[in-house]
């Protein structure tokens, strides 16, 4: 099969012929139909997050089941599915206590003594986040996918596989935004826009979008932002405090920077909660003014929207099909696998919402 | 000769050890792969040297900044 392989950080992905194993007892072979190109892929491509190489990037996809392992009963050949990196074992402490997205069990991948899922001759190709969706086939654990209804367009479904779940989930699950509360979202990429859409669905009062790109702020308005702030033109913290007369109940950082994480904290009203969704580079420290804790401010991380994706994703599909979740505007371009490097380069400019790879069927 | 301690950058588990004590390593050679929040994160030699100590075993948990290996340069 063809796949986009990362062999060295900060070099383009190479389209190569790669081999994929047959499904083990609890594995599923999926033929992706669509795969989103996400900013998180860029973090690994540019080395700000190290990863075992060579690897096939990509982690936001929807496809059709091609073959199932001998013990798999949840899906069958032909089922439409969304894949998710939050593969869960189902029996560790985190899973049993309801925190499936924090499952760290290695059993959803293959162990070092087993044949790798992906290889090129004798060379192991490391699977990215147990998925590797920039490829014509994916071999994944049965707990890394969810069945969806077949009237859901696959390119939209792919977005639910990561950015939608991460942004909407951060609002619904991690933060628990209440109707009427004021929300600010810093960063209007795919995840930030999903958080804005999620805040609108949750019934937030004021929804303030903060970014430095006009087109993204316009997009944010169409997804539910009630106010926009161009952080390149003003003091964003001061603007938020003035608009909300003292700060937000909830803020979301969706970029992954020290400065914007600290701004998310500063934008809070007493008792408010900041949720950091963005992937802050390894080794970066964040500074908070200690006295602010007297005001009962809270700060927390959110990984993949604290999801329970087997429940969440079908609901998000319904939200899209009944008009609440606006995914059409999120896709700026459909591309081929061979154009993935151009899509990653476009992400660096911050101009486009999302490129989606469409595979030939 | 100087000994260089190699810390883990993240909290996670040792998934695979790819080098052995006594191996001669070039800078950036992978010594082990950690698994942390679904990611396979390599621990690499920061400079060329000989691997003189491995301080963890497969499946061990490691903390951020914990020294996991030592090389002699």
Segment roles from a protein language model:
Chain A
Residues 2-4, 14-19, 31, 62-64, ...:
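Residues located in well-ordered beta-strands
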Residues 9, 213, 280, 305:
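Residues in the short beta-alpha loop(s) of Rossmann-like NAD(P)-binding domains
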Residues 21-35, 46-96, 101, 147-151:
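Glycine-rich beta-strand-centered segment in the early N-terminal region that forms part
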Residues 85-143:
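Cysteine-cluster motifs in flexible loop/terminal segments that predominantly coordinate metals
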Residues 136, 143-145, 149-234, 238-239:
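Mid-domain Rossmann-like dinucleotide-binding core that forms the NAD(H)/NADP(H) cofactor-binding site
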Residues 175-179, 191, 201-202, 212, ...:
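Glycine-rich cofactor phosphate-binding loops and adjacent beta1-alpha1 units
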Residues 246, 250, 262-266, 310-361:
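C-terminal hydrophobic helical "lid"/dimerization subdomain
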Residues 272-273, 287-329:
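Rossmann-fold dehydrogenase core element
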């Amino acid at each position: 099969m063809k796949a986009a392989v990362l062999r060295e950080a900060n070099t383009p992905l190479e389209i190569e012929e790669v081999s994929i194993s047959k499904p083990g007892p609890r594995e599923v072979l999926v033929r992706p139909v669509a795969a989103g190109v996400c900013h998180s892929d860029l973090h690994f491509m540019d080395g700000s997050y190290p990863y075992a190489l060579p690897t096939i990037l990509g982690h936001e996809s929807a496809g059709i089941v091609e073959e199932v392992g001998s013990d798999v009963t949840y899906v069958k050949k032909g089922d439409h599915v969304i894949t998710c990196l939050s593969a869960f074992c189902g029996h560790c402490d985190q899973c049993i206590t309801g925190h499936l997205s924090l499952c760290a069990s290695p059993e959803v991948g293959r162990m070092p003594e087993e044949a790798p899922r992906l290889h090129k001759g004798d060379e192991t190709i490391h699977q990215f986040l147990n998925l590797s969706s920039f490829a014509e086939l994916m071999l994944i654990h049965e707990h890394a996918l969810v069945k969806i209804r077949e009237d859901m367009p696959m390119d939209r479904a792919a977005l639910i596989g990561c950015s939608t779940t991460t942004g909407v989930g951060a609002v619904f699950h991690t933060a628990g935004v209440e109707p009427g509360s004021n929300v600010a979202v810093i960063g209007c990429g795919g995840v930030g826009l999903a958080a804005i859409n999620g805040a609108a669905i949750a019934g937030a009062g004021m929804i303030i979008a903060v970014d430095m790109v006009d087109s993204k702020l316009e997009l944010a308005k169409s997804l539910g932002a009630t106010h926009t702030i161009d952080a390149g033109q003003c003091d964003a913290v001061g603007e938020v405090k003035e608009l909300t007369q003292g700060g937000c109940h909830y803020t979301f950082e969706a970029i992954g920077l020290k400065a914007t994480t600290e701004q998310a904290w500063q934008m809070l009203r007493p008792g408010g909660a900041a949720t950091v969704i963005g992937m802050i580079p390894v080794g970066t420290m964040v500074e908070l003014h200690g006295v602010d804790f007297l005001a009962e401010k809270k700060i927390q991380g959110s990984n993949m929207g604290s999801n329970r994706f087997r429940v969440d994703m079908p609901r998000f599909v319904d939200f899209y099909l009944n008009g609440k979740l606006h995914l059409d505007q999120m896709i700026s371009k459909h591309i081929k696998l061979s154009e993935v490097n151009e899509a990653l380069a476009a992400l660096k400019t911050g101009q486009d919402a999302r490129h989606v790879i469409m595979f030939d069927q | 000769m100087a000994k260089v301690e190699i810390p883990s950058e993240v909290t996670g588990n040792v998934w695979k050890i790819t080098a052995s004590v006594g191996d001669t390593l070039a800078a950036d050679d992978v010594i082990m792969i950690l698994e942390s929040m679904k990611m396979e994160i390599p621990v690499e030699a920061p400079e060329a040297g000989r691997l003189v100590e491995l301080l963890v075993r497969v499946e061990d948990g490691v903390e951020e900044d914990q020294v996991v290996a030592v090389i002699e340069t």
